[in-house]
Structures are given as C-alpha cells and as structure tokens.
Amino acid sequence: WRREKPKLLISSGVFFFLPLLVSIAVLWPELGTSYQGWPIRPATFITCLGLAVSFLTFERTLVLGFRFLTTPLHQPDELEYSPQIGRRAFVLGGLGLIAAGSGAAIVRRLCQLASFSYDGTQYKGTEVQAITPNDKFYCVTKNVIDPRIDPSLWRLEVTGRIRHRQTYNLHRFKSLPAVSQETTLMCISNGLGAGLMSNALWRGVPLSTLLRAAGPLPGAAKVRLHCVDNYTDTFPLSKAMDPSTLVAYEMNGERLPDRHGFPARVVVPGYFGEKNVKWLTRIELTGADAEGFYEKQGWGPDFKIPTRSRIDVPDEWAWMSLAQMPNGIPMKGVGFAGDRGVSKVEVTVDGGKTWEQATIDYPGTKLTWVLWSYDWNPPRPGEYKLSVRATDGAGVVQRVEKARGPFSGVTGFHQVTVYVAA
C-alpha cells in the first residue's frame, strides 16, 4: 500500500481532481442546465456529481488498464508457451467492439434527439393559415438537444425582491385561473421576406397572477426569467404585469410541444421571440437589468417589434401570363405590428409612387398578424417590383427605422421581382 499510495495520489490528482475542478470552474454558469427539468440548485448538484463519477471512471479505467497491460500474469520458463499477449489482445479487442457498438448506439440516439431537424423552421408561402399548426410553427433554439422535461420533476419558483417566495408544481400551477389568447411571435433575426414568424392560440396563467401572489417589494423593476436549459432573459416589471403577458402551458388546444417549451413558456406580446422564453423554471424580480443569452451575443438593445409586412404570393422571380390570369394576378401575405395591431395594408407595383389598399382577409387581434390579399391587374407585360407596407393600430405607417441598428430587428419593405408575359 505504501508503494502504491504515491501512484494513487498522482493518478487521482492528474486524472480526477484536476479535471473535475477545472470543469466545474469553466462550466459553472451552465451547471444548472437540466435535460429533464430539475430546479436549478438540484440540477447543479446532480451535474457536479455526474462529472465526478465520469472523471473517477476515467481515472480508474486508465490506471487499471495500464496495470493490466504491464503486469505479467506469471513468469514462464523458456520452454513454456505464454498466452498472455493473446489473452490480452482478445480482451482488449472485445472491449473495443463493445465500446464501438455502444458509441454507435449513443450517436444514433443523440441524432434522433438533436434539434437539427427543426431548428430554423420557417412558416411562409402559399399555405400560410391564420393559426399556425404546432408542427409548422417557426422554431429557433440555442440547444443541440432540447430539454425533454419530466413533469413530475418540474418546479416553477418565484424569487428575488418579493415578500413571499413561491414554488409551484405542475398540478398547482395549472389549477390557477387561466386565459386563452391568440398571439403572434417573431424572431429578432427574421428577415423582411423570411418566415421566422407564426401565430397560435395560447392558454396559460397571466404572469401578473404569479407576481401578485409573491408580492413585489419596492425597488423591483425587472423580471428575470430562468429556464431549465440555462437560458435567461429580462424585461420590465410593468410589461410582466400586463394582463396579456402569459405563462402558457397549452398551444392551439394541445399541451405545449417539447420544442416549444413544455411544460411552461412565457408569451410576451410585442417583444421579439427571444423574450418569450421556453422551459421556464424560475421567475426572479430584480432591481436592475441583466443581459440575456442573445443580448450577450450582440442582439438588441431594442426588443420591441416594429411594424412589418410580407408578400407570400407571388414568389420572387415568378413568371406569369396575362392570358392565363384574365381576372388579375393574386397577391397575398401577412402584416404584423407587435402588440399594436394592423389597421391597413397597402401594395405598390411602381416603386412606391402610388400605393393601393389591400383587403384584410383575417384581421386577428391587436396581438396578432393579419392576412391580406390584393388582385393586381398589370397594365402591360414586363418586369415589375412589388412591395408592401402596413399601418399599425395607432396610424403609424411602416418605415425604415435606421436608429434601431442592424441587431434590433430589420426594418424596411419586403419586395419581390416578377415577370409578366403577354
């Protein structure tokens, strides 16, 4: 034992304690991440324990493997056949096959769970409906693998500058008075003609209900949201107290899909999608602002949605024939103004010299997009540039907002070029 003790101290120090401490230090901001939905503190402990077991297994495997390869089984005489090498090669080969098979199975499972198949899903084109089906709702995630939360483990905490700390399990949370509300969400990175925008009917508990039960203290000015994937974001307490700001648990009459935040996500009308956090686990009242995940990457600082509109039909560089469309060429699209509603949509086919009012086929509410259409009769064959603009509920016409900067949501007018033949 005395001879082995120095070796044990060296191997455990180099291959166990040192990498464990370095990993905890480097990964500390991420250790509260929980794939199954543990609250942040238990998740941090479980992750640290998992790292310790992993590094201990690694250290023991290295030490015992080295000892197995270097220690002779016995000392044969010159005439005796020694099968040690053959046995060891057989054992190592078998272990290698097991490791390879296990690794391949793990990779297959990870590929099945990965978000690659749906991250960046867009919703646009000829099939756009007033209410977006759940499986076609736009989706953006920071995770390679999104959480799959066990509802029995999930808790929602209300902490910070409050009088009464609150903790809800899923049953208690869903027993609170709930409302249903149609709201459109849009990603801050959505281009003028892109489809990172969708509309759904949400059901959930007003965030104000949870905050009033906790009793905000003087000095509380911001609400910081914490999610099980370690995502955080912040918005003003005044917006959190708005009756339209929800903690939603249903989407279009169904439980929230995993990719959209099951069991609870926040819906904040008028703010870009990054503020509508998914997999919510803690609501913290603070006195100061704190940068969220995407804000740290440079997005912002303005997160309120500007007035936007889009042409879905016809497509860019579409070729059409006047002879085949005697009743005119149909134009269709959407208009959206955050939480201000859309009162009017107009189109131009002459570079903005004249604007014609489109028909609003689906008016929605002040929290949703509108669907519009217009029958266009080109005066002659040729190339045309079509564009659209919307007017919000306060009468403010869509415009280029240079002061917003490139990372606070692009502004301007969506334009498509089409060619009309005789």
Predicted feature residues:
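Structured, non-membrane catalytic/scaffold regions adjacent to prosthetic-group chemistry
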Residues: 1-16, 25-49, 53-64, 106-422
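Short, glycine/alanine-rich hydrophobic alpha-helices that insert into or span membranes
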Residues: 100-102
